[in-house]
């Protein structure tokens, strides 16, 4: 009987070419992928099983390193269709990624390149071959971590310098990143939702006009609005209420985005407060939800570890139904701080944090989660129809069914 030598697991690292250095001095070694260099950021974990390209290009992840809890990332490669940031040339999104297993060759008919090459093109530093379950447990116990991720193919690292960078990084609190990821000038969005038969079509006969304030908007949000008949004009985060009203919109959308919502107080929050008073239908998502709460007199707070994934249960108090939704936020609205004329409409069934609000007597509402998914379940797509119905009501038109009827 011949003894066989145990095979080395494919994710076992032979030589360190990347490190993650936490602010407390902890050093985690692994294999480097993607771009080279070093960058400070906050380390979070995401529990989604699919959609890594959409996750990494979501501008809400600016200033963050995403740890994927699912072990096999990159199996379906990458393409130009699944990105979410509005201006790909500016590469807004996560600055780092952490994987359990090494990236394998892609196997998917839509793959245009392998994930490693795509990460390099996007400027994303990646670390593979580590115990992501242990890192996730650390984040759950200690909270989201300030850190430096570094990649050098030769494995040369000045750990003392990296530890100092991690310890001295300011973190996301009081950090305004919306100005960094917003568009430079206005644009009209016409792309429709993707279908297998036609890919992305182009809108030709809009029925309504929605102005979207871009604090880091995702493409699929804009597609769902155009898919419901809205012409969408996208304005920069710094647009004033007068800028918005000059477009004579039927509705206003407040987008998702990165950073601390309170840090936008000098420009976006006052603008939102003025727009609420106009009576124009208004819908906010994620950062837009948080800034709306601030404009209404509420408060926001930094969360321990945040919510990042595509499997979060949320209850809609307006219907009594429970939805499974996508989430990506590290700040939350303090529901106890909301004034009497603001109702809490949605709540997380994981930890009871606020996930939605509406203003009594006004066509104004928002949610913390991501109803557009991309990636994730489509349980909350009805919220876009709810927004369009507020526009239709103001025009004297009959409402659309909030949920598509089964054939």
Curated annotation (Swiss-Prot):
Its EC number is 6.3.5.5. It catalyses: hydrogencarbonate + L-glutamine + 2 ATP + H2O = carbamoyl phosphate + L-glutamate + 2 ADP + phosphate + 2 H(+). The active site is at 286 (nucleophile), 370, 372. Residues 1-205 are annotated as: CPSase. SMART domains: CPSase_sm_chain. It comes from the Bacteria. Keywords: Amino-acid biosynthesis, Arginine biosynthesis, ATP-binding, Glutamine amidotransferase, Ligase, Nucleotide-binding, Pyrimidine biosynthesis. InterPro entries: Anth_synth/Amidotransfase (IPR050472), CarbamoylP_synth_ssu (IPR006274), CarbamoylP_synth_ssu_N (IPR002474), CarbP_synth_ssu_N_sf (IPR036480), Class_I_gatase-like (IPR029062), CPSase_GATase1 (IPR035686), GATASE (IPR017926). Pfam families: CPSase_sm_chain (PF00988), GATase (PF00117). One of its GO terms (molecular function) is glutaminase activity. Residues 209-397 form the Glutamine amidotransferase type-1 domain. Pathway: Amino-acid biosynthesis; L-arginine biosynthesis; carbamoyl phosphate from bicarbonate: step 1/1; Pyrimidine metabolism; UMP biosynthesis via de novo pathway; (S)-dihydroorotate from bicarbonate: step 1/3. SUPFAM superfamilies: Carbamoyl phosphate synthetase, small subunit N-terminal domain (SSF52021), Class I glutamine amidotransferase-like (SSF52317). L-glutamine binds at residues 60, 257, 259, 287, 290, 328, 330-331. GO terms for biological process: 'de novo' pyrimidine nucleobase biosynthetic process; 'de novo' UMP biosynthetic process; glutamine metabolic process; L-arginine biosynthetic process. HAMAP family: CPSase_S_chain (MF_01209). Belongs to the CarA family. Small subunit of the glutamine-dependent carbamoyl phosphate synthetase (CPSase). CPSase catalyzes the formation of carbamoyl phosphate from the ammonia moiety of glutamine, carbonate, and phosphate donated by ATP, constituting the first step of 2 biosynthetic pathways, one leading to arginine and/or urea and the other to pyrimidine nucleotides. The small subunit (glutamine amidotransferase) binds and cleaves glutamine to supply the large subunit with the substrate ammonia. Composed of two chains; the small (or glutamine) chain promotes the hydrolysis of glutamine to ammonia, which is used by the large (or ammonia) chain to synthesize carbamoyl phosphate. Tetramer of heterodimers (alpha,beta)4. This is Carbamoyl phosphate synthase small chain. It comes from Brucella abortus (strain 2308).
């Amino acid at each position: 009987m011949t003894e066989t030598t145990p095979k080395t697991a494919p994710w076992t690292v032979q030589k360190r070419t990347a490190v993650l250095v936490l602010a407390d001095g902890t050093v985690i070694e692994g294999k480097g992928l993607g771009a080279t260099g070093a960058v400070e950021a906050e380390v979070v974990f995401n529990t989604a099983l699919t959609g890594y390209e959409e996750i990494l290009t979501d501008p809400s992840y600016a200033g963050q390193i995403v740890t994927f809890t699912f072990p096999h990332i990159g199996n379906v490669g990458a393409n130009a269709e699944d990105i979410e940031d509005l201006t790909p040339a500016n590469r807004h999104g996560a600055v780092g990624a952490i994987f359990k297993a090494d990236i394998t060759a892609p196997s998917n008919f839509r793959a245009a390149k392998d994930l490693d090459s795509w990460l390099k093109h996007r400027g994303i530093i990646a670390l593979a071959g580590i115990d992501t379950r242990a890192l996730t447990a650390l984040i759950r116990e200690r909270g989201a971590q300030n850190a430096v991720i570094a990649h050098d193919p030769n494995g040369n690292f000045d750990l003392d310098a990296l530890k100092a960078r991690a310890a001295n990084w300011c973190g996301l609190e009081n950090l305004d990143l919306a100005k960094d990821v917003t568009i430079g000038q206005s644009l009209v969005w016409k792309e429709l939702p993707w279908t297998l038969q036609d890919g992305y079509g182009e809108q030709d006969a809009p029925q309504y006009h929605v102005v979207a304030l871009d604090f880091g908007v995702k493409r699929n949000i804009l597609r769902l609005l155009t898919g419901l008949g809205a012409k969408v004009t996208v304005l920069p985060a710094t647009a004033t209420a007068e800028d918005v009203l000059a477009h004579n919109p039927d509705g206003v959308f407040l987008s998702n985005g990165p950073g601390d919502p309170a840090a936008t107080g000098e420009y976006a929050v006052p603008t939102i407060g003025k727009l609420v008073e106009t009576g124009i239908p208004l819908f906010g998502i994620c950062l837009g939800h948080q800034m709306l709460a601030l404009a209404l007199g509420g408060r926001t707070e930094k969360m321990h570890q945040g919510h990042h994934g595509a499997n979060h249960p949320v209850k809609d108090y307006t219907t009594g139904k429970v939805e499974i939704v996508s989430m990506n936020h590290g700040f939350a609205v303090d529901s106890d701080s909301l004034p009497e004329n603001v109702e809490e409409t949605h709540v997380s069934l994981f930890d009871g944090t606020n996930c939605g609000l509406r203003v009594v007597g006004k066509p104004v509402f928002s949610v913390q989660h991501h109803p557009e998914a991309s990636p994730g379940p489509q349980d909350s797509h009805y919220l876009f129809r709810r927004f369009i119905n507020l526009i239709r009501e103001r025009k004297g038109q009959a409402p659309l069914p909030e949920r598509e009827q089964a054939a």
